[in-house]
């Protein structure tokens, strides 16, 4: 559903930001 897609996108976004901040 839409919520699952949103959660997946948000999760990858958070991971990307976390990786950017950590490096």
Curated annotation (Swiss-Prot):
Residues that bear Serine amide: 23
A single GO BP: defense response to bacterium
Location of this chain's protein in the cell: Secreted; Target cell membrane
Protein name from the UniProt record: Alyteserin-1c
Family to which the UniProt record says this protein belongs: Belongs to the frog skin active peptide (FSAP) family. Alyteserin-1 subfamily.
Any single GO CC term annotated in Swiss-Prot or TrEMBL for this entry: extracellular region
Function: Antibacterial peptide with amphipathic alpha-helical structure that shows selective growth-inhibitory activity against Gram-negative bacteria but low hemolytic activity against human erythrocytes (LC(50)=145-220 uM). It is moderately active against the Gram-negative bacteria E.coli (MIC=25 uM), K.pneumoniae (MIC=50 uM), P.aeruginosa (MIC=25 uM), A.baumannii (MIC=6 uM), and is weaky active against the Gram-positive S.aureus (MIC=100-250 uM).
Tissue specificity comment: Expressed by the skin glands.
Predominant cellular place of this UniProt entry's protein: secreted
Keywords of the record: Amidation, Amphibian defense peptide, Antibiotic, Antimicrobial, Immunity, Innate immunity, Membrane, Secreted, Target cell membrane, Target membrane
């Amino acid at each position: 559903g839409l919520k699952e897609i949103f959660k997946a996108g948000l999760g990858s976004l958070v991971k990307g930001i976390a990786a950017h901040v950590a490096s």
